[in-house]
């Protein structure tokens, strides 16, 4: 891996070689909590699992505090389960592995993105790759909000085909997730797996760039359990901005949503809970929360938790996508 810098995004100067002691196939480069992070996969056979057993492809991060000095030590970022039998583990065994690590979009105190589920097979051209949704609270360790869920199947976004040749598609994530207006645009690779034995290439070996679009930040929704009429959820501790700010939500069915604030130990705050709970007047991608009691600006710089209560009715089906703190 090498760094590179540019004054204009067109002309680039490569940095020094030998930053790391291993081969890395990376999909993303981002900054989180002041650290520069490269997220990718490694195939190094010296990386062992439980009891010294072999491992398949898994995701790791490589970290720098200043972009110039990179830690020689890496950290596991996202890994899929290895087979129970250690003899069935390894790069060339037929089970799901992680390809290219994780490519996230950073939203301040959370990162949301995609990883590729590499459907490893003994015959290379039988391999395909689907996308899974992952998120992180520190930019290093990622997890699936719903374990085992395929966010985008390769067969639902296939690479341009070749007549009478049913090649598999491998979806490849990258630093191509952008918020543009009211959309989240996901640019990603579609790899036509036409690899031949012994690493030779055919004229069918090919890749292309694809685009999938979401309503902005609507990666998934939190809803009331189908068998219930109401439910609630707490946030992790959040330090509110020291300057003027506004809390907003990305939601539908907002007449069925109420917002409360507590201290870090879950004790609800007077003026921000109960009859003074916040509410939203309209559905939308960034709807302001209205507070009948105190304004959250009075809590500037303090650490709080956000509690959201959702209530379903015959006319309202609340769906929560995101909560924002917007500096004004």
Which residue ranges define each predicted feature?
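Carbohydrate-active catalytic/glycan-binding domains of CAZyme proteins
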Residues: 1-328
